[in-house]
């Protein structure tokens, strides 16, 4: 496990999730994808991941895109950047004609960000139905 992934799975975060009978986002990715195939996609280098980890990988040798919400970061709530990342991933997957897996572990919209956070749900929904 690289240093960045280790930081996501700090002992505190693992204990917090495991005490609720849940896996951490990174553990979920590791269980879903073929070994050593996950490639994280970041919109802005060195920007915080904002409670959602996204990327591509393979399942039984077939390419898939996925995003996994991390409840240990602000309850997995969807904010503006979080929603922008998911929309970006959905667009990439559509262009490459690949399936998308979304693992939702969220408390909903990040109310502190107001209507701009709520609007991201509309962007994501629009991408799914367009």
Question: Model-predicted segments: where are they?
Answer:
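Terminal-region recognition feature
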Residues: 1-130
């Amino acid at each position: 496990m690289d240093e960045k992934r280790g930081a996501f799975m700090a002992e505190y975060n693992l204990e917090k999730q495991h005490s609720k009978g849940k896996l951490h986002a990174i553990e979920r990715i590791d269980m879903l994808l073929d070994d050593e195939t996950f490639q994280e996609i970041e919109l802005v280098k060195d920007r915080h991941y904002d409670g959602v980890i996204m990327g591509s990988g393979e399942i039984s040798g077939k390419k898939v895109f996925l995003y996994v919400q991390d409840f240990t970061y602000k309850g997995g709530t969807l904010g503006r950047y979080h929603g922008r990342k998911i929309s970006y991933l959905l667009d990439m997957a559509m262009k490459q004609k690949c399936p998308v897996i979304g693992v939702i572990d969220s408390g909903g919209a990040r109310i502190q960000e107001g209507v701009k956070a709520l609007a991201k749900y509309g962007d994501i929904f629009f991408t799914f139905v367009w």
